Amino acid sequence: MKNIEDLIQKAVELQNNGLGTGQIADELNVSRETVTWLLTRSKKEVAAPAPKDISVNWSSIGKSATRLHYISLALCDMVIETLEKTNTEVDVVVGVAASGIPLASMMANELGADFALYHSRKGQDMVQPGQKGTISRNFGSVAGKNCVIVDDVITTGSTTMEVIEQLREMDAKPRAVVVLVDKKGADTIANVPIQSLVRIVRVD
C-alpha cells in the first residue's frame, strides 16, 4: 500500500467482507486505534488526528513459500542464539493466528520441535472481560514445555502479553518471542526476551 488512501480503501474493503476491527488490524499490521481512525476517516466524519502508527506490508515475503522458508531460518537462528544463553531447548513453537502460523510451522520443522497454534482474542470485536485466547487442541500440547512464540508484528505488545499469560496459566514456559517486525521496541515482555528481524523506533 502506497499511501493513506490505499489503507483507508483496504480497511473499508475488509470491513465490508465481514472482518472486525481486530481482524482488520491484524491484516494491515496496524493497531485497532488506527483501524478505527481509518474507518472513521472513510466516512468523511470530523477527523481526529491520526494515531502514531506504522503500517507494515510484508506480503512480498508471505506470498512466497521460498521466502518464508528463508525468513524462518533467520528467525530460528535468533531463537538458537537466545536460548543458548540459558542452555534451554525448544520443545514447542507456538504460532499466533493467523500471520504467525506459516513461519512457526516452518520453524518447528527446522528446530525439531512440536507446533502449537494460538487463537488470539484480538480477532473478536466483542471481547468480554476475562475472555482469553486459546491454544488449539488439534496441534501440539504446551503444558510443562519450553515454548517459543512466533508472530509477524508486535504493535502494542498486548497480543504477545496475552499469549505469554495464557501459556503460563497452562504450566508452559515461554522462553522467547520472535517476530518479523517489532514496532513496540521492547527488549522483553513479561520477562520474556523479544527478538525481531526489524525493530522500528519512532523518532518524534
From Swiss-Prot:
Keyword Transcription regulation: yes
Organism: Methanosarcina mazei (strain ATCC BAA-159 / DSM 3647 / Goe1 / Go1 / JCM 11833 / OCM 88)
Gene3D superfamilies in UniProt: 3.40.50.2020, Homeodomain-like (1.10.10.60)
Family: Belongs to the purine/pyrimidine phosphoribosyltransferase family. GfcR subfamily.
PROSITE patterns: PUR_PYR_PR_TRANSFER (PS00103)
SUPFAM superfamilies: PRTase-like
Entry superkingdom: Archaea
Domains (record comment): Contains an N-terminal DNA-binding winged helix-turn-helix domain and a C-terminal regulatory domain (or effector binding domain) resembling phosphoribosyltransferase (PRT) domain.
GO MF annotation terms: DNA binding; orotate phosphoribosyltransferase activity
Lineage: Archaea, Methanobacteriati, Methanobacteriota, Stenosarchaea group, Methanomicrobia
The protein's name: Transcriptional regulator GfcR
Entry keywords, A to Z: DNA-binding, Transcription, Transcription regulation
Pfam families found in the cross-reference section: Pribosyltran (PF00156)
Keyword Transcription regulation found: yes
Any one GO BP annotation for this protein: pyrimidine nucleobase biosynthetic process
